[in-house]
Swiss-Prot record:
Entry annotated with the keyword DNA-binding: yes
Name of the encoding gene: addA
A matching Pfam family: PDDEXK_1
Protein name listed in UniProt: ATP-dependent helicase/nuclease subunit A
Described purpose of this protein according to its UniProt entry: The heterodimer acts as both an ATP-dependent DNA helicase and an ATP-dependent, dual-direction single-stranded exonuclease. Recognizes the chi site generating a DNA molecule suitable for the initiation of homologous recombination. The AddA nuclease domain is required for chi fragment generation; this subunit has the helicase and 3' -> 5' nuclease activities.
Annotated keywords: ATP-binding, DNA damage, DNA repair, DNA-binding, Exonuclease, Helicase, Hydrolase, Isomerase, Nuclease, Nucleotide-binding
Catalytic activities: Couples ATP hydrolysis with the unwinding of duplex DNA by translocating in the 3'-5' direction; ATP + H2O = ADP + phosphate + H(+)
Amino acid sequence: MTIPEKPQGVIWTDAQWQSIYATGQDVLVAAAAGSGKTAVLVERIIQKILRDGIDVDRLLVVTFTNLSAREMKHRVDQRIQEASIADPANAHLKNQRIKIHQAQISTLHSFCLKLIQQHYDVLNIDPNFRTSSEAENILLLEQTIDEVIEQHYDILDPAFIELTEQLSSDRSDDQFRMIIKQLYFFSVANPNPKNWLDQLVTPYEEEAQQAQLIQLLTDLSKVFITAAYDALNKAYDLFSMMDSVDKHLAVIEDERRLMGRVLEGGFIDIPYLTGHEFGARLPNVTAKIKEANEMMVDALEDAKLQYKKYKSLIDKVKSDYFSREADDLKADMQQLAPRVKYLARIVKDVMSEFNRKKRSKNILDFSDYEHFALQILTNEDGSPSEIAESYRQHFQEILVDEYQDTNRVQEKILSCIKTGDEHNGNLFMVGDVKQSIYKFRQADPSLFIEKYQRFTIDGDGTGRRIDLSQNFRSRKEVLSTTNYIFKHMMDEQVGEVKYDEAAQLYYGAPYDESDHPVNLKVLVEADQEHSDLTGSEQEAHFIVEQVKDILEHQKVYDMKTGSYRSATYKDIVILERSFGQARNLQQAFKNEDIPFHVNSREGYFEQTEVRLVLSFLRAIDNPLQDIYLVGLMRSVIYQFKEDELAQIRILSPNDDYFYQSIVNYINDEAADAILVDKLKMFLSDIQSYQQYSKDHPVYQLIDKFYNDHYVIQYFSGLIGGRGRRANLYGLFNKAIEFENSSFRGLYQFIRFIDELIERGKDFGEENVVGPNDNVVRMMTIHSSKGLEFPFVIYSGLSKDFNKRDLKQPVILNQQFGLGMDYFDVDKEMAFPSLASVAYRAVAEKELVSEEMRLVYVALTRAKEQLYLIGRVKNDKSLLELEQLSISGEHIAVNERLTSPNPFHLIYSILSKHQSASIPDDLKFEKDIAQIEDSSRPNVNISIVYFEDVSTETILDNDEYRSVNQLETMQNGNEDVKAQIKHQLDYRYPYVNDTKKPSKQSVSELKRQYETEESGTSYERVRQYRIGFSTYERPKFLSEQGKRKANEIGTLMHTVMQHLPFKKERISEVELHQYIDGLIDKHIIEADAKKDIRMDEIMTFINSELYSIIAEAEQVYRELPFVVNQALVDQLPQGDEDVSIIQGMIDLIFVKDGVHYFVDYKTDAFNRRRGMTDEEIGTQLKNKYKIQMKYYQNTLQTILNKEVKGYLYFFKFGTLQL
């Protein structure tokens, strides 16, 4: 059928119009990010109904998630209703409003489930089956693997013995079990899992396939050998320009001859490469050589660097790809064949037994959905069944969203119910292979790529391909910079798809013409000498500064009104590859009182409230586990003190278990009676809960614990109470879900939790923040897919790719199979095998390709502005990245394949564009003006140097709260209506004062006034402060190992508090004696001296401020104060404030009748390049001006005299206010 002509004035682009109306053959729509694919998909469905008269239930629409399916169905229903209202006499539209409820708009799993429910008789299964929960499936599969391994231990086949010796350790079979599990999940992602498993051994037995693997490695090694040869020639060219380097040139000449032999005829001579030594040592560069080439020092260093690069590339090829002769590699494959075959047999046994167990329990999992559906739709020979033919007749079109994320089982299911071949089929597929980021879920992007390469724009002879490239989301600066990065980063070799004109993004959004460049921020870490913060913590602080800058200076454009509004918290998202940085960000945002939310799938089991409940459950299950028993005793529930625990243990120090020590203490006549009563009550509780757990499900046990000890109420009252409460209810709900499975009991529930923790799975902290809540969000790139935000901060760019799987003894790949290292049982030595080397190389290439696609997803989330945050140890590494090798229009293949992280590539590409110092052969273009507008980058690159003095943390040892202090509220028995009405109508005359805190610290007032100055509601800010309190570390942790930054800050304050002031100044020797005295008096810990910054204190002693204080008439240290805030703020009469201000001033001195206060400060700040001390001083003064003003006003109120003040920063110096 031909595509109708597009009328004038329609909103659709030409490509969108074709996507809506193309028919008569299979259609693949390559929809780039922000190109409106969902709108196109909905419009196509609507036009099928309105224009072609097709009933909505005759269309099968497959989405990736249930949420997408619901949204799609809602949109279609809405459009049908609108059309029906416009044409009320249309009977066809009226029918669609009824049929929409039966429409097949769902995930493929939902479609499969419906298929099974309708045709369960074909499968010979009980129709009353249910879907297994995650908990049940995990436990059942683990149980099955354990049982199957035990069965094979009974058989003790020689191949099995060799497998266990290779893949198990002396202590456990954990690695062996993990490999079996991975193989199971890989296999069931194929239409015929057992056939896939049977084929794993083929490369180990057939020489033809082994030859293919050697060729694969040869082709890959050619990339690195060619790059090595280029580096060697560059070294030669550079040395040729110099004097007195004949010996160096002679070595390089020999290497060039060897390399010429390896590359002779354009082929790689692998036997010659492995049979000869390469990379001879280069003679030292002597002082005489440097003197002779004093004008070419940089070139000399570059020549050495190029030769070093040559050696490393050759070493990589020889060690990673051809560490052994080809014949030896083939021989190893023969030795491994029986082991691989036996491993496949074990996995098939697991598969069969796992299926048997599921059938006996009458449960199905998601894998069963797909394979049972396939069983219904195919005959034994693989051809479509009669049922499949009926579905082919029924569905007039099949529409698949997110096609790039399908696997081969799902592809087979779709092929069974579609009609025709590609040239005359009815399959409509939408997706973007550049956003295929779910390989860990067995998604297979090659399915999309194969069709993309096979289909044509005009659709002649095969399927039709349509490229949706116009982006309606982002500003042109975001798009052009993204295009430029990927034009030089992604191709078929690395990235699996060519980023050409068809793939790139074209501007289509109606923004104004103002300039909003992409910002690439490079943070140069401060070393340990200049900062107590780790590199990750420094980056977190830096990100907060970017957020503050956005809130203060940036606006958001409204496309509908054509006007700007101020940026708010919810306009900003921080994207990271994983949640590894979440804790640092939470703390950094908390320090600045910026509302911040992480919807993490990690960290749930680390939450204090969850750990408490799990300790309780473990102690009830087995009180002989000391960690959990003592943890429960020390918790807020039972509140045993350290001294009490010590008393118990001292009485019987040789007991194996602490529980025994408790029993022995209770029975000891000399024991403390009060402690004995407390212990008896505790043990009574334990025994009572144990008895309760025998007769009740886990969720009821948890509920009883919550109610008995007011657990929900207690944690709800802490900072972050909403989230803590949600976490507690989340654990309760998980217990309910667990009890609904076929497993029962406390032991099984704990085992399930342990399995999740051990394998790194997590429930994630419960989400208590809605999509419209005004908070800064952090999310992973995966969870951001499909979303958009005005401001995107893409951070963590310098975090290395996770290549842990590449180091495993077994490498799995859907296309190639299984690569197992060779293990010599007699010598107990492991070697890379031909298969493991080849598949490891393939896996690394696929991993880097997927990481590139993740970068693409991250960059294309930004609507208005994009911030890229990288971090380096020193700025010298940036020069190396600028000089990264290129090949044609791309960063060289070897550089991309070995790239450690995204920053490595992004900075190299963008810095080359801006650099004026690198030679032309390292640039992509000689003239920037030659770049087309659509891919001309608009980016600001800034390098920021982090300088820091430890942030100050005030710890309160006196605050202690207990659930036992909660009082039970008593209901009154008053029933006189008049009295009730009088009480309900009563209005408290001082209601405004109730909204004011009775006591505030100066720091709290500082935060309040800062947020008021910025136009932010302070109460709103406080409401969203992250729920992580700062508690002092236990003494035994503080006394051992490295102190944290806040502990060092407290230590420095303690030293300054007692520091003597002498007119002649104290010497360094006297300072050491003074600190030894503090240790002797137990004012500071014995091991504290190593953490005291002596040089900084000596700097203070030698300062002018020290001299002024030493000559003062009076000196007061650590002076506490409490004063009425109304007096300090000088409020008018009638506006008195009931609040009081409480604080502590580090030091006050009196000189010449004038009172001065001194506040010692520790702080973190960014010293940007070129920043003067005066500018930093102004910055720090502004930061503390509110706090210092309160100190000044407070002292003037108390003393009724003029007061002046100083700030002293340990690493910066004195600032007078």
